[in-house]
């Protein structure tokens, strides 16, 4: 595992894996924030509460993806400057991006509080869970500043090769989240609001810890007065990368949000099944998503250092690693789909169980598709072509949304059509992205 890694030297596969493993572990722990809520809420409160948290999670991901996209885009710029050895440009970029993303966070927070009810009505949230979902989201977005701070500092540390430190603070936060969930729900009987409060408090601990560590232990990232200025070059670079990556994340999650509205129209049982299955699927393919992010950092550092031969070798190594890992995960999810669903739902809830198993087995058979797509996203960001990542996202999500509504309208297909639209969108975007890569690189 790397704490202060120069990704422009050393064996490619070993370097990538050592850098990626803490990020994979961190991504799984990140899912535990919502998994802890989902598991405890589903088992201790009931199916309605599970449906509320699951549907809320989709909206949370869409809105938080704006901040995440800005942080990912900024992190790519940080990696390019770090790989080129330009530390003064790195610090200027850190200042510009922090101010930019901080301002967006404030605007987003105000927008959520003003328009939360119209958004929930647009999503066709059933009345029997409307109040629970609204209360949960209100509390979650009171703590959105913690999400911004943690993601920003984590992106900054990873950009300079430290993938371990964000993991430790996240692990502490997840452990606290689970303890507080149990205390607030089982002991204080605060219900779904208690789960939201636990998540916000845990995220606050993670953000405070990572800020304090960076200030004390990483003086090269500490800003000086001379770094705190908006020079045109830094501002243009950050806005270009961050905006396009933000658009990519937003398009991705807006498409998912539209599909959530379609899922909601099938009733609470399908909503609950989808909520549980999405959490399982997120665990299953989140490692390849983080591998794609680590791969992007690797490519960006080497692109900044002009190590183009190493980039080509890295592409081949990453592709092979992703395919092997994805096949293993696909087999495991297909075989153990029912036991995995039983973690979240009671055995007697047969309709929820059957629907969730169907979702997992259809989507899970094609995890290679999403794994390769994450590599393509990371590659095009790192070589200063973030617009191509947006194009691939539009292809993937556009196909998914269109097919979902088309197939779900066929009585003999119904909700199953929504599940099939997911891998079809992945595979189509993969084909376009790989064809473009071969056209530009001749290999």
Language model features by range: what are they?
Residues 1-20, 78-143, 187-243, 299-366, ...:
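Short alpha-helical transmembrane segments in multi-pass integral membrane proteins
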Residues 9, 13-32, 36, 59, ...:
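Residue-level signal for short hydrophobic patches within transmembrane helices
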Residues 18-37, 139, 150, 173, ...:
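Transmembrane helical elements of multi-pass membrane transporters/channels
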Residues 24, 28, 32, 36, ...:
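Generic alpha-helical transmembrane segments of integral inner-membrane proteins
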Residues 28, 32-50, 120-127, 183-190, ...:
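Helix-terminus/linker motif at the lipid-water interface of multi-pass membrane proteins
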Residues 47-58, 137, 196, 268-283, ...:
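Small-residue hotspots at the loop-to-helix junctions and early N-terminal turns
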Residues 50-110, 147-166, 273-337, 370-392:
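Small-residue-rich hydrophobic transmembrane alpha-helices
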Residues 71, 139-158, 166-174, 195-210, ...:
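Short runs within selected transmembrane alpha-helices of multi-pass transporters and secretion channels
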């Amino acid at each position: 595992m790397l704490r202060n890694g120069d990704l422009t030297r050393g064996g490619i596969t070993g370097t990538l894996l050592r850098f990626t493993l803490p990020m994979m572990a961190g991504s799984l722990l990140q899912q535990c924030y919502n998994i802890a809520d989902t598991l405890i809420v589903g088992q201790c409160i009931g199916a309605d509460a599970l449906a509320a948290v699951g549907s809320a999670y989709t909206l949370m991901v869409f809105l938080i993806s704006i901040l995440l996209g800005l942080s990912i885009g900024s992190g790519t710029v940080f990696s390019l400057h770090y790989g080129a050895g330009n530390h003064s440009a790195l610090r200027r970029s850190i200042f510009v991006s922090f101010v930019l993303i901080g301002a967006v966070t404030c605007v987003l927070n105000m927008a959520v509080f003003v328009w939360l009810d119209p958004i929930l009505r647009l999503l066709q949230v059933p009345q029997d869970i409307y109040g629970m979902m609204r209360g949960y989201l209100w509390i979650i977005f009171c703590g959105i500043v913690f999400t911004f701070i943690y993601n920003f500092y984590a992106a900054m540390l990873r950009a300079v090769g430290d993938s371990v430190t964000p993991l430790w603070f996240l692990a502490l936060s997840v452990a606290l989240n689970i303890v507080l969930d149990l205390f607030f729900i089982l002991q204080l009987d605060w219900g779904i609001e208690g789960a939201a409060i636990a998540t916000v408090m845990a995220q606050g601990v993670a953000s405070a810890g990572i800020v304090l560590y960076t200030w004390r232990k990483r003086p090269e990232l500490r800003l000086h007065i001379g770094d705190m200025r908006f020079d045109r070059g830094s501002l243009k670079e950050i806005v270009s990368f961050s905006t396009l990556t933000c658009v990519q994340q937003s398009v991705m999650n807006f498409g998912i949000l539209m599909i959530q509205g379609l899922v909601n129209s099938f009733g609470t049982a399908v909503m609950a099944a989808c909520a549980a299955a999405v959490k399982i699927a997120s665990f299953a393919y989140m490692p390849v998503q983080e591998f794609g992010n680590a791969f992007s950092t690797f490519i960006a550092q080497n692109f900044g250092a002009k190590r183009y031969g190493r980039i080509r070798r890295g592409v081949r190594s990453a592709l092979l690693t992703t395919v092997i890992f994805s096949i293993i995960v696909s087999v495991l999810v297909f075989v153990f789909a029912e036991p995995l669903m039983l973690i979240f739902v009671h055995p007697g809830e047969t309709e929820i169980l059957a629907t969730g198993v169907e979702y997992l087995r259809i989507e899970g058979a094609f995890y290679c598709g999403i794994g390769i797509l994450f590599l393509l996203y990371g590659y095009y960001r790192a070589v200063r072509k973030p617009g191509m990542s947006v194009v691939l996202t539009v292809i993937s999500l556009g196909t998914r949304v269109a097919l979902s509504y088309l197939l779900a309208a066929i009585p003999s297909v119904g909700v199953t059509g929504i599940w099939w639209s997911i891998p079809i969108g992945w595979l189509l975007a993969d084909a376009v992205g790989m064809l473009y890569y071969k056209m530009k690189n001749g290999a």
